[in-house]
Swiss-Prot record:
Belongs to the P4HA family. This is Prolyl 4-hydroxylase subunit alpha. Catalyzes the post-translational formation of 4-hydroxyproline. Residues 169-284 form the Fe2OG dioxygenase domain. Binds 1 Fe(2+) ion per subunit. Transmembrane segments: none annotated. Keywords: Cytoplasm, Dioxygenase, Iron, Metal-binding, Oxidoreductase, Vitamin C. The gene is phyA.
Length: 284
């Protein structure tokens, strides 16, 4: 059946019906199979507990109020995360240079013979940044060209460490990092970063951290991240609201957005400027 001429939203639904769930992998998108990309009606029955029996003496970055917001609202925004203009500029330059040197690849969904691409669904270019257990970038050639990005990743590791040190039984498994560049006209349709269940506790993304480095971004440039705020993790919310509530988060430089990977749907609105640069680290 040829569905190439159908509207994008119809193609999405058809692809969702004929696809089979698959586990996350480094070559796929943040929604790693067609089913996860399309079928956004799934709701997990496993909650992410970020506020019980906290070891408050280990707080360095967060406090009880911020963790409560992350658990109940599902997201947290930290502006001026690095608060270092020189570092921000260097991270921007390193990121864009990776793109200009053709180190990024066009993003797609799924992998192998099942991999598919459609810029009307997802239009970014990506590069995976792999670090070892000692927080060293595994690719030595890459390491020498993104020293300031690695500095940022060290700072994001401190957040992961604080989750482990403050929240009993958080027990992070690993992190995964991706550099993404969108050009003018690029977008990414509504999706979740993972689906959380008792059978996949060790393979699911739990926390998404997105760092933006878009200098001189202004209203009208597009590329906002539309975050849908119906949060199934909120135990006080007896049932999800039928109306879709959302906030549009501006991708301004030195802004860090943190949200619950399995629960909050989101999309990248069409970019009217380029490059739109985001560095995402997921905590498993």
């Amino acid at each position: 059946m040829d569905i190439s001429n159908l509207p994008p939203h119809i193609r999405q639904q058809i692809l969702g019906l004929i696809s089979k769930p698959q586990q996350n992998n480094d070559e796929s998108s943040s929604s790693n199979n067609k089913n996860n990309l399309i079928n956004n009606e799934k709701v997990s029955n496993v909650l992410i507990d970020l506020t019980s029996n906290l070891k408050i003496e280990n707080f360095k970055i967060f406090n009880k109020e911020s963790l409560n917001q992350l658990e109940k609202k599902g997201y947290l925004i930290i502006d001026n995360f690095l608060n270092d203009l020189n570092k921000i500029n260097l991270i921007y330059d390193e990121s864009y240079n990776q793109f200009k040197e053709n180190k990024l690849i066009e993003a797609g969904m799924n992998k192998g013979t099942d991999k598919w691409k459609d810029k009307s669904i997802r239009g970014d270019y990506i590069q995976w940044i792999h670090r070892d257990s000692n927080s060293r970038i595994q690719d030595k050639d890459l390491s020498s060209t993104i020293r300031n990005i690695n500095y940022l990743l060290d700072k994001l590791d401190l957040i992961k460490n604080e989750f482990d040190n403050v929240i009993p039984n958080f027990n992070s498994i690993k992190t995964q990092t991706q550099l993404a560049v969108y050009l003018n006209g690029g977008r990414y349709i509504k999706h979740r970063d993972s689906f959380y269940s008792s059978e996949s506790l060790t393979i699911s993304r739990r926390i998404t951290m997105i760092y933006y480095v878009n200098k001189d971004w202004k209203k009208g440039d597009g590329g906002e991240l539309r975050l849908y705020t119906n949060n199934p993790n909120n135990t006080n919310q007896k049932e999800l609201k039928q109306t879709e509530e959302f906030i549009d988060i501006e991708p301004i430089a030195d802004r860090l957005l943190i949200f619950l990977s399995p629960f909050l749907e989101h999309e990248v609105l069409q970019c009217n400027f380029e490059p739109r640069i985001a560095i995402t680290t997921w905590i498993y």
